[in-house]
A protein has these predicted regions:
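Feature recognizes metal-dependent phosphohydrolase scaffolds
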Residues: 2-209
């Protein structure tokens, strides 16, 4: 990589860090309104759809970990809201990064299931779902695992082979992460789910779908 390109990449990374850092600035108290709060001495971060963008995920996590180190909250919670895979170029890298983070002792990490994880997991056991999944972003996910996805009109045997290869490519850490996914989680006054909640229905009675 030439020096000018390296400098450009460094500047872009710094711009990303500055932009993300602004998100952590404390907002003024809007007097007269009830403020939703986390449990005492608990800081919660929530990260939405990552969609295979491992590079941006790493930048964001670096800022969060720096914030944890600087403020030392009694409890630091990180909630991922689902849709880790598909569309972006590096679904495998995202899963690898999340697996590494789940072993981090200073942060309580929670993974929620998104519809894209459901699509991928469906393909693992039902290969004929492959064409629909690939139109939905699964093509890029398969590519990140080194799997060349078949085309929509290809014989079922090719989709079965792609499903088998993905099953073999997912290591035990990936499977443990996928198995740990929840439909929702709550901390204090905050309720987290991938696609929101049905208005008028108590949270305890929400349909996970």
């Amino acid at each position: 990589m030439c020096d000018s390109q390296a400098l450009a990449n460094e500047a872009a990374s710094e711009d990303q860090r500055t932009m993300i850092g602004r998100l952590f600035r404390r907002s003024p108290d809007p007097g007269g309104r009830r403020i939703a709060r986390t449990p005492p001495d608990t800081v919660v971060w929530a990260i939405g759809d990552i969609h295979g963008c491992s590079d941006l995920l790493r930048v964001l996590l670096r800022v969060i970990l720096e914030d944890v180190a600087a403020h030392r909250p009694q409890r630091a919670v990180l909630v991922f809201l689902g849709d880790y895979v598909d569309r972006g170029p590096d679904s495998k890298g995202v899963l690898d990064t999340l697996c590494e983070l789940s072993a981090h002792r200073e942060i309580d990490v929670h993974f929620l299931r998104g519809n894209h994880e459901e699509r991928m997991e469906g393909f693992l056991v039902q290969p004929d779902l492959g064409p629909g999944w690939c139109e939905y972003g699964g093509r890029e996910c398969l590519g990140s695992f080194g799997i060349n996805p078949p085309e929509a009109g290809d014989p079922p045997e090719l989709w079965e082979e792609a499903s088998l290869r993905l099953n073999l490519a997912l290591d035990p850490r990936h499977r443990a992460l996928l198995a740990s996914q929840k439909a929702s989680v709550a901390f204090g006054d905050f309720f987290f789910a991938h696609a929101g909640a049905e208005p008028g229905v108590p949270l305890s009675e929400q349909d996970p779908k």
